[in-house]
Curated annotation (Swiss-Prot):
Superkingdom of source: Bacteria
Source species of the chain: Mycolicibacterium smegmatis (strain ATCC 700084 / mc(2)155)
GO cellular component: cytosol; oxoglutarate dehydrogenase complex
Residue sites binding Mg(2+) per the record: D645, N678, I680
Binding site for thiamine diphosphate: R540, S604, L606, D645, A646, A647, N678
Protein's pathway: Carbohydrate metabolism; tricarboxylic acid cycle; succinate from 2-oxoglutarate (transferase route): step 1/2; Carbohydrate metabolism; tricarboxylic acid cycle; succinyl-CoA from 2-oxoglutarate (dehydrogenase route): step 1/1
Function noted in UniProt: Shows three enzymatic activities that share a first common step, the attack of thiamine-PP on 2-oxoglutarate (alpha-ketoglutarate, KG), leading to the formation of an enamine-thiamine-PP intermediate upon decarboxylation. Thus, displays KGD activity, catalyzing the decarboxylation from five-carbon 2-oxoglutarate to four-carbon succinate semialdehyde (SSA).
Catalytic residues identified in the record: H314 (proton acceptor)
Name recorded for this polypeptide: Multifunctional 2-oxoglutarate metabolism enzyme
Length: 1227
């Protein structure tokens, strides 16, 4: 018995073969072996230790006869001389029979002989256990399907068995011992570590097969992922011939798997130096069922078995211990925790299949549960989807009780049973295993789908048919194209980070996949033959989108980083580089179409641009006649809107804008929403920023399908993008894509996010980018080579570097203070706004040109008749003057859009722009008749009048966007009361008042704000004149408060005809709508124009004497009529009233000319109804004395006291205050 068995065991032949090669030519052996082989001394082999050599059989030649032996002397007996080996002893040479072939066993074969002989010295026994293999089989299918979809590779049964053996050894360390004689004494040696020996079958160059046993060292310290990596490393190096001496030594327990050859039960030999060897047999059904059909086996609940044997050294391991060891392996292979650990280690986010007892219920009962399970996946499958690339909570499986087969009374034994599915996945019957495969592929992989909240069954079916059907994998060319987009996205950010360290750019790092996603949206729109995609997005990633989607030249982007300004675009304040817009043309890579692409300008106010985009797109659609009123290729301009997750859930304008989606006055035929969900809002976690499960839950209010997709899967992102466009085209509805990703850096490049999200950023800091992960996947699948990937990235980086160097060489323009935009647009000096009487009469007649059989409400008919009368006889009121202005513009070919809450009728029952049939509810719009000339030809004009949703923010934003999208349209929005316009303050501040100065974005939008103190309380009084005057500068807007119907008429017509695009803010009347004094004659419409300053009629008609005036009252709006009535009552010839109709820009020349006509004025007062700190006074009190010091030095105010609210809530207090103003004015 050897006291020191070879450390290489059955691998000794390989070591000796390497030694012979090393001895003959050291360079022929891997250098890692040199140090060992220098001192190696091979033991005698079987063929050299005895005379038992075998040779190739040949004809036997008789030996030469030996001389006759001499007689033996009669001496004392001597020890018998050694004779030739007797036949019974193995050392004796055998003589092959004639015709036999013999071969000397060398190398591996000789080592096998030696090792088998040595193994005879080990007294062994064997324990045998049959273990159910079904759970291992089913979970291996789940594992390998996941690996196939993700990083590639496979898990074998041997991987699982080997790991189970290692875990069992932890409970039974004696199984890891081996026997040795130490100092002449029998000893049981317990190694410090478990070194699992793997029997690896290798095929040589000559085709001969050999077996080596290499060790996975220190297995007990490894988790499953580490164990698999070490396992695969050993196998790979064995097949590449790169194993080292260290790999062969120190095996403590072995695993052999003859089951791969079909062997069911094996009792392997145990080599010296080991305590046990585990044999794994083939997986088979019990013999008595091997002739049964699959259906019968499934019905009976029969599973395959695997037979494990434990052959152990009986000197140190007892049978009970070996049996318990196998029982522990048995338990592990059926244990929930064992497979839970494996799934977590492999990054599989789903629960493993569980070992449960078969449920004896009938197949009919179970069939109903299967149908319920299908419905559950359609409803809740998204809750189990693997959509978070960070997997911050990697200890929790994505699961839901409704999606657990066990919750439905089903078990793993039902997986191979067939059930009726009534057309699910296009078939009538299907195995539960296949049903689950379809459901999980459809709803639980890298895409989670929410659609069962949609009320229309047709739309649900449409989605089901597409997501439950296996979709084609992208072609290699398409994969390379996706990779090129990822390359471009990442390289752009890396370049800017390197070249412009510390500059804010709000990078897209961590969310680069949105670039191929957006590209897929635009490409699919082009595939459908659409006209344009208009994009709105926040600042994060905007520069990347400008460069890689819109196609803005890199040189221009880099110039903006360098601080270079284009002199031709230098007017106005400008804006930061990540707020600017651009336009471009997208050309399909794999198609023949192209499509226009534009990116709207936006402020930092998140989501404020949403309604602006919708309005802009609707305007473009109406221009192309493909909007709500169009018929061919409806809604051919597509809004593509990007959001942040925190903003989408948190900003109310999102819900306001979504609410417009299906309204006839606001529909755009479906918006594609992409939420770039980086799972954080600056420093706020989702748990603190929303109460809903998803940031996108708000979109369910309009029945929009929602696709949650893992941003680390570019192919899934591109597939979802194309599906979203197809749905939009099929149903003209919004679609929401929630792309989960992360933010590589802080909110901006100077921020350290680890201060508030340390764990998240520990994960992010070690995470590979999506480009690298996708590249590795493509290379691993053999779709591209490493060189192709590196070349593509280098080419893009080189292109950026060249442009960067060119920009650095540009001559920098000297930076000067910004210039005003005021001079960029001027109203024509001789613009005619009057119309002839025939036009007035035509509009009047239109109000009674009712459709045949149309029944007018009895309270509305007098209004229509009165309008026709006014058109012919005069005394035209405010409401009709407005309709005359709009109708005449329509007749001249202008598209007029008027919207607001209750706008068709008017808040104050004054407008009646749309007449409703008393009996049928049909609508008649008189002004639409003006779109046709008397001879029947179209004028080109159109009247679009809509009641809006009860919204200010979204409604005003939409109309602003519409005015940008169609600069030639007359776009008006009316507040229900002027007080409510502050609900749209962000739109007013960020777009209406400053859009031109910041972005050169022009708008002609008109805001009609009912304003006036009439005792209705603080929320029904003021349109906040002071706020608009504070915002006004550089001619950014026109602000007016006309006091006569005719002046209002001319103001609107001037705005519609002046050819410039600047917003118009009009403070319109309420009580004055029915003031009999507030009317205008026909000649005021046919002969006049807008007058920014108005004197009293008595002076313009020559009836009053201006020289008698010593007290001048300047005012604006409704209070003029109260002042005029008081003056007439008191016959005050010393008092004159001058109205400033245009509050901004101030008509300084006309104002000065008017005041010069009153030479004897001693006192000048500004009279207003508003409190002292509101209305026009805060502006006029400062600017009038400044711009006209000769006329307004000493100007005094008459008004209500300064107040925090616009007015008193008491009508009686209001009356007292109003009287006090009048008394003071004439005091």
């Amino acid at each position: 018995m050897s006291s020191s068995p070879s450390p290489f065991g059955q691998n000794e032949w390989l070591v000796e073969e390497m030694y012979r090669k090393f001895r003959d030519d050291p360079s022929s052996v891997d250098p890692s072996w040199h140090e060992f082989l220098v001192d190696y001394s091979p033991e005698p082999t079987t063929d050299s230790a005895s005379n038992g050599r075998t040779t190739t059989a040949a004809p036997v030649t008789p030996p030469t006869p030996a001389p006759a032996p001499a007689p033996e002397p009669k001496a004392a007996p001597k020890p018998a001389a050694k004779t030739e080996a007797k036949p019974a002893k193995p050392a004796k040479s055998a003589t092959p029979a004639k015709g036999d072939e013999s071969q000397i066993l060398r190398g591996a074969a000789a080592a096998v002989v030696k090792n088998m002989n040595a193994s005879l010295e080990v007294p062994t026994a064997t324990s045998v256990r049959a273990i159910p293999a079904k759970l291992m089989i089913d979970n291996r299918v789940v594992i390998n399907n996941h690996l196939k979809r993700t990083r590639g590779g496979k898990i074998s049964f041997t991987h699982l068995l080997g790991y189970a053996i290692v875990q069992a050894v932890k409970k039974f360390p004696n199984m890891n011992r081996h026997f040795a004689v130490v100092d002449g004494k029998p000893t049981a040696i317990t190694p410090a570590h478990t070194n699992l020996g793997l029997a690896i079958d290798l095929q040589g160059k000559d085709g001969n097969r050999s077996l080596v046993v290499a060790a996975i060292k220190r297995c007990e310290t490894m988790r499953f992922g580490q164990f698999i990596a070490a396992y695969e490393d050993i196998v790979r190096r064995a097949r590449d011939g790169k194993l080292t001496a260290e790999d062969f030594s120190g095996v403590t327990i072995s695993l052999t798997n003859p089951g791969t050859l079909g062997t069911v039960h094996s009792v392997p030999r145990l080599m010296q130096g080991q305590g046990a060897i585990i044999g794994a047999g083939a997986m088979e059904y019990p013999a008595e069922f091997q002739g049964a059909s699959e259906e019968r086996i499934a019905d009976l609940g029969i599973g395959k078995l695997i037979t494990l044997t434990s052959t152990y050294d009986h000197r140190i391991i007892q049978g009970a211990e070996s049996g318990d060891f196998l029982r522990t392996i048995h338990q592990l292979l059926l244990d929930d925790d064992f497979f839970d650990e494996i799934f977590r280690e492999l990054g599989i986010p789903y629960e493993p299949v569980r070992w449960r007892t078969d449920n004896p219920d009938s197949i009919e009962d179970k069939n109903a549960r299967v149908i319920e399970l299908i419905a559950a996946y359609r409803n809740r499958g998204h809750l189990m989807a693997d959509i978070d690339p960070l997997r911050l909570d990697n200890t929790r499986f994505r699961s839901h009780p409704d999606l657990d087969v066990n919750s439905h009374g089903l078990t793993l034994w039902d997986l191979d049973r067939e059930f009726k599915v009534d057309g699910f996945a296009g078939v009538q019957r299907k195995k539960l295993r296949d049903i689950l495969s379809v459901l999980r592929d459809a709803y639980c992989r890298h895409v989670g789908v929410e659609y069962t909240h949609i009320l229309e069954p047709e739309q649900q079916r449409w989605i089901q048919e597409r997501v439950e059907t296996k979709h084609d994998k992208p072609t290699v060319a398409e994969q390379k194209y996706i990779l090129s987009k990822l390359n471009a996205a990442e390289a752009f950010e890396t370049f800017l980070q390197t070249k412009y360290v510390g500059q804010k750019r709000f990078s897209l790092e961590g969310a680069e996949t949105v670039i191929p996603m957006m590209d897929a949206v635009i490409d699919q729109c082009a595939e459908h033959g659409l006209d344009e995609v208009v994009i709105a997005m926040p600042h994060r990633g905007r520069l990347n989108v400008l460069a890689n989607i819109v196609g803005k030249p890199y040189s221009q982007i880099f110039s903006e980083f360098e601080g270079n300004l284009n002199p031709s675009q230098a007017h106005g304040s400008g804006d930061v580089k990540y707020h600017l817009g651009a336009t471009g043309t997208y050309i399909q890579m794999f198609g023949d179409n192209d499509i226009e692409v534009s990116l709207t300008a936006n402020p930092s106010h998140l989501e404020a641009v949403d309604p602006v985009l919708e309005g802009l797109v609707r305007a473009k659609q109406d221009l192309l006649d493909t909007g709500e009123e169009g018929s061919d290729n409806r809604f051919s301009v597509v809004p593509l809107m990007l959001h942040g997750d925190a903003a989408f859930a948190g900003q109310g304008v999102v819900a306001e804008t979504l609410n417009l989606a299906l309204l006839r006055g606001y529909r755009t035929g479906g918006t594609i929403h992409i939420v770039v969900n980086n799972q954080i809002g600056f420093t706020t976690a989702p748990t603190d920023s929303r109460s809903s499960e998803y940031c996108t839950d708000v979109a369910k209010m309009i029945g929009a399908p929602i696709f949650h997709v893992n941003g680390d899967d570019p192919e899934a992102c591109a597939w979802v993008a194309r599906l979203a466009v197809d749905f939009r085209q099929a149903f003209k509805k919004d679609v929401v894509i929630d792309m989960l990703c992360y933010r590589r850096r802080g909110h901006n490049e100077g921020d350290d996010p680890s201060m508030t999200q340390p764990y998240m950023y520990d994960v992010i800091d070690t995470k590979r980018g999506s480009r690298k992960a996708y590249t590795e996947a493509l290379i691993g699948r053999g779709d591209i080579s490493m060189k192709e990937a590196e070349d593509a990235l280098r080419d893009y980086q080189g292109q950026l570097e060249r442009v960067f160097n060119e920009v650095r060489e540009l001559e920098k323009h000297e930076i000067e203070p910004s210039e005003s935009v005021e001079a960029d647009q001027q109203i024509p000096s001789k613009l005619a706004t009057a119309v002839d009487k025939a036009m007035l009469q035509r509009i009047g007649d239109a109000h009674l040109a009712l459709p045949e059989g149309f029944t007018v409400h009895p309270r509305v008919r007098p209004v229509l008749e009165k309008r026709r009368e006014m058109a012919y006889e005069g005394r035209i009121d405010w409401a009709f003057a407005e309709l005359l202005a709009l109708g005449s513009l329509i007749a001249e070919g202008k598209l007029v859009r008027l919207s607001g809450q209750d706008t068709q009728r008017g808040t104050f029952t004054q407008r009646h722009a749309v007449i409703v049939d008393r009996k049928t509810g049909e609508e008649f719009t008189p002004l639409q008749l003006l779109a046709t000339n008397p001879d029947g030809t179209p004028t080109g004009g159109k009247f679009l009048v809509y009641n809006s949703a009860l919204s200010e923010f979204a409604a005003v934003g939409f109309e602003y966007g519409y005015s940008v999208g169609n600069p030639d349209a007359m776009v008006l929005w009316e507040a229900q009361f002027g007080d409510f316009v502050n609900g749209a303050q962000s739109i007013i501040d960020e777009f209406i008042s400053s859009g031109e100065a910041k972005w050169g974005q022009l708008s002609d939008v008109v805001l009609l704000l009912p304003h006036g103190h009439e005792g209705q309380g603080p929320d029904h009084t003021s349109g906040r004149i002071e706020r608009f005057l504070q915002l006004w500068a550089e001619g950014s807007m026109t602000i007016a408060m006309p006091s006569t119907p005719a002046n209002y008429f001319h103001l609107l017509r001037r705005h519609g005809k002046d050819g410039i695009q600047r917003p118009l803010i009009v403070f319109t009347p309420k009580s004055m709508l029915r003031n009999k004094a507030a009317v205008s004659d026909i000649r005021d419409f046919t002969e006049s124009k807008f007058r920014s300053v108005l004197e009293e009629p008595m002076y313009t008609d020559g009836e009053g004497d201006r020289n008698k005036v010593t007290r001048l009252l300047l005012t604006s709006g409704k209070i003029y009529y109260e002042l005029a009535a008081r003056k007439a009552k008191e016959n005050r010839e010393d008092v004159a009233i001058v109205r400033i109709e245009q509050l901004a820009p101030l008509p300084r020349r006309r104002l000065a000319e008017t005041l010069d006509r009153y030479p004897n004025v001693k006192e000048k007062f500004w009279v207003q109804e508003e409190p002292a700190n509101q209305g026009a006074w805060p502006s006029f009190g400062l600017t009038l004395p400044e711009i006209l010091p000769d006329h307004f030095t000493g100007l005094k105010r008459i008004s209500r006291r300064a107040m925090s609210a616009p007015s008193s809530g008491s009508s009686k207090v209001h009356a007292v205050e109003q009287q006090e103003i009048l008394d003071t004015a004439f005091g």
